[in-house]
Design a protein with these regions (language model features):
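Electrostatic, structured charged patches in enzyme active sites and in nucleic-acid/phosphate-binding
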Residues: 1-131, 136-137, 146-175, 179-191
Length: 191
């Protein structure tokens, strides 16, 4: 039986009880970005149980319940990795490779910067784009607006690659409006 990790406290967010503050903070970050929250909705059997002829008890299935599904991306919130989790994670990787190769797995340690970093290469895959609008208007009174596949591409095209991503994360979450002269928003693509 696994030991309980110390300093992990349940937390409520929008009527849902999450098993840890990190999970609740991740749900809040996904919600602020306008992404659907799918929390622990599927159980994956990553190792099938079996019986041995010479043993009375059955070896039980090993099951894994992902913390969040964002499209076909699994987000697992882990502040601390136990030896049990390290082994189970290997079984999860093997299961996904063999059974659901289109599913992408990410483990996040915080609910903001690493979450955006994990999702950033996959916005289009999830049906989103990054809309960047300048705070300055041109001679015609229009602000520069462009859609980008990722924050990284937008930063490179705008010459901001040396700037920190943290303020942009706050802008994507609606906490801060203009960052480095631009408003950053996540926009659902219409297909």
């Amino acid at each position: 039986m696994a030991e309980r990790i110390q300093n992990v406290h349940e937390k409520w967010y929008k009527g849902v009880k999450y098993k840890s503050t990190l999970e609740a903070d991740t749900a809040e970050a996904l919600d602020r970005m306008g992404l659907p929250i799918r929390y622990e909705e599927r159980v994956l059997t990553v190792f099938e149980g079996f019986r041995c002829d010479y043993q009375k008890d059955k070896v039980r299935d090993v099951e894994y319940k992902p913390d969040f599904w964002v499209g076909s991306i699994i987000l697992e919130c882990k502040g601390f990795e136990t030896p049990e989790w390290k082994l189970k994670k290997k079984l999860v990787f093997k299961y996904l490779k063999d059974n659901e190769p289109d599913v992408i797995f990410y483990q996040t340690k915080d609910a903001r910067k690493s979450l955006i970093t994990a999702l950033d290469p996959h916005w289009n895959y999830l049906g989103y784009a990054i809309r960047v609008t300048s705070s300055k208007k041109n001679a015609n009174g229009h602000a520069f607006t462009a859609l980008y596949d990722s924050v990284a591409i937008a930063m490179k095209n705008l010459g901001l690659e040396k700037k920190p991503i943290g303020p942009i994360v706050r802008s994507l979450m609606g906490i801060q409006e203009f960052v480095f002269g631009y408003n950053w928003k996540l926009e659902k693509l219409r297909i």
